[in-house]
Structures are given as C-alpha cells and as structure tokens.
Amino acid sequence: MIKRAFTIFILTLLLFFNSPVYSLDNSSKTLEKYTKKISNKFTRTFCNTSKFGISYEGALAFAIGETNKEFKNNKLNKLIDYSLLKNLIVNDLENDCQVYDFTISKLENLKFN
C-alpha cells in the first residue's frame, strides 16, 4: 500500500513539474559574431605587442597564446571554421595594423582544443 502511494506521488510530481529542455542556440549569426570577436582580440594583441617593440615572431607567439587562453573553454569552438577565422585575422591585420606580409600559415597554432 505504501509502495503504491509512493509510486503515485512520484508519478504525479513528474507529470506536473516536468519542464521542457531546449537545445543550445548555435545560429550562424552567433558563430559569426564569436569568430569576429576572436579575430579582433588576436589583431589587437598582435598590433599592440608589435608596436611595443617586440619582434613579429614574439608578437605572434604572444597573440596566439593570449587568444588561446581567453577562448579555449567556449562551447562554440567545436563549430568554428578555422579557415574563415584565419582569413579574418589576416584581413584585420592588413586593415588595422598595416601588416601586409602576414601569411595564413603562421596561424597554424591557433586552435582551441
């Protein structure tokens, strides 16, 4: 008898207090905004470091390290198109820092895994 009452009580709780589960919204706009945020962070860090007087190799290593450190724990990292991200970074470096000899191959270590 007690077992039956307990079962009915639990089933009633599950029936009335069941809340729906929604999936995470990973729209293309959200992903594009996140990619642009990463690109801006890398570009700012690289420009400031190279203007401070550090060599391009040192500025590159520092910018990659800082960007990896800031964005490594985000759930959107699995969805990033790295070729698009690298192209955005190169374009931002040309437009913001006037660095025209920067190639995409220098960004091989920019991974958030």
Feature roles, as predicted:
Residues 2-3, 17, 36, 105, ...:
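Generic cytosolic/nucleocytoplasmic N-terminal low-complexity/intrinsically disordered segments
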Residues 6-8, 19, 52, 78, ...:
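Residue-level marker of intrinsically disordered, low-complexity segments enriched
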Residues 1-24:
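Classical Sec-dependent N-terminal signal peptides that target proteins to the secretory pathway
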Residues 57-113:
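Compact alpha-helical subdomains of small soluble proteins
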Residues 17, 40-41, 90-91:
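Processing junctions and N-termini across compartments
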Residues 24-75, 95:
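Short N-proximal segments of mature Sec-exported proteins
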Residues 1, 15, 52, 94-99:
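Unusually extended, aromatic-enriched hydrophobic runs near protein termini
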